[in-house]
Amino acid sequence: MARYIFITGGVVSSLGKGLASAALGALLQARGFTVRLRKLDPYLNVDPGTMSPFEHGEVFVTDDGAETDLDLGHYERFTGVSARKTDSVSSGRIYSNVLEKERRGAYLGKTIQVIPHVTNEIKDFLAVGEDEVDFMLCEIGGTVGDIEGLPFFEAIRQFAQERARSQCIFVHLTLLPWLAASGELKTKPTQHSVKELRSIGIAPDVLVCRSEHPIPEKERAKIALFCNVRPDAVIPAYDLKTIYEAPLAYHRAGLDQAVLDAFQISPAPRPDLTRWEDVMDRLENAEGQVRIAVVGKYTQLEDAYKSIAEALTHGGMANRVRVRADWVDSEKLEGEGAHLLDGYNGIIVPGGFGERGTEGMIAAAKYAREKKVPYLGICLGMQMAVIEGARNLAGMPDAGSEEFDHEAGKTRFTPVVYHLKEWVQGNYTVQRKLTDDKGGTMRLGAYTAVLVPGSKISEIYDGALEIEDRHRHRYEVDAKYRDQLEAAGLSFSGMSPDGRLPEVVEYRDHPWFIGVQSHPELKSKPFQPAPLFAGFIRAAMDNERLV
């Protein structure tokens, strides 16, 4: 049965609980343990699938089609363990499950209350798969004291109480603010955060203290005394140049040892951190630099493209080169022109929804095609590349997407991209209507693409004729225009196994121009970069040498 580590936060949000959880999972793996990481989000949305990227950041999609928090991306990148639907839950999902059970009569006429019905639902979620791994790391979103988070804190308190003391521990992440006027770190916010946590029945075993300045030993001792933890369980967490330094930094600070001590695991297996030392070597000793323009709709918030940013870093590691990614607002291209892309060694157009900014994406695809600049179009980025080719090469000047017509409420375009109403998933066929609810109704999760032998995409994947990547879309390039587009030079080099859905397009006469309907960035890891991103950066390096 798994040991449980509950990671909570206090003082302020966005302190890095997700990264701390991912780094701790990686450190436990380095000691030979198996791990799984989970995220419990107190917001009332059922999942983040319908939330604005400006509100929530990226939606991370799992192999089995769950739309989850971007922290699950950190979990996967650091541990290599593929997340599942059962690794992410929100208050909305919990309450939805409880109400569905009430309607079915599952509670036998009882009055439904937060305790025990909601807390029991949360505990049932925590217990799924507990026999599969050595450690289950569960991050609670938000901060202690948030009203919407109280049922989760109560549930983990009960969960720990119902198990042996040596089976559950609590790690609490707090902030030590620096007061410039007095030139000192202040521990009082941490003390009050722990006081708040203890008031709901949870006593932290390990404190992780975020700080911009070194934490003196006397301050660590003071925190330990007032918060009732061991001095060596007060772990400093400083700002780092790269998130991939976190496992090594937390190991030096003693986080993994403090956790094992709290579980009374002795002697603790020695860690093998070779993998992370190699990652840092590739980052710190990179030679040269390539400049990449990411032309998107949500560039004001980099977290909206978190996996893109990390996959570019991984591609740089694979080629031992630094990647400088600039976030270019696609609407700005519409107003100021594609000359804004001059000087870049590669262009990425990532996914998105809605018509806003898409003419700028189309302009970026045209610029890359005509200037022979490496281009990677992802999801919407592939669709915009197809529309650009249809308009300017295949004699369809009014080519566009049904998505834009549906948004405007009138027909304006020849729909080379159409609303996907049916597709094969496993052994059955999924059917969708335009009037369906938005949440959870897209083509989600891992799907196979069958590749054309000898195509560039096949070469990138070492000659593979089938690849599998994750998807998140409800619009698709219409295969009925395939012959017309291929005659214009745009090759359909990857299709769904039934031959109905285009998965990959590429230009035969271009050094490197590929569009994919999937999201290969979601499976990229620092020690296993996504082949498409490694190949894209390699092509950008070739372009840099030509400039």
Curated annotation (Swiss-Prot):
Positions annotated to bind CTP: 13, 146-148, 186-191, 222
Gene that this polypeptide is encoded by: pyrG
GO cellular component, one term: cytosol
Record CDD domains: CTPS_N (cd03113), GATase1_CTP_Synthase (cd01746)
InterPro entries in the cross-refs: Class_I_gatase-like, CTP_synthase, CTP_synthase_N, GATASE, GATase1_CTP_Synthase, P-loop_NTPase
GO MF annotations in UniProt: ATP binding; CTP synthase activity; glutaminase activity; identical protein binding; metal ion binding
Organism: Paracoccus denitrificans (strain Pd 1222)
Stated name of the protein: CTP synthase
Residues annotated for Mg(2+) binding in this entry: 71, 139
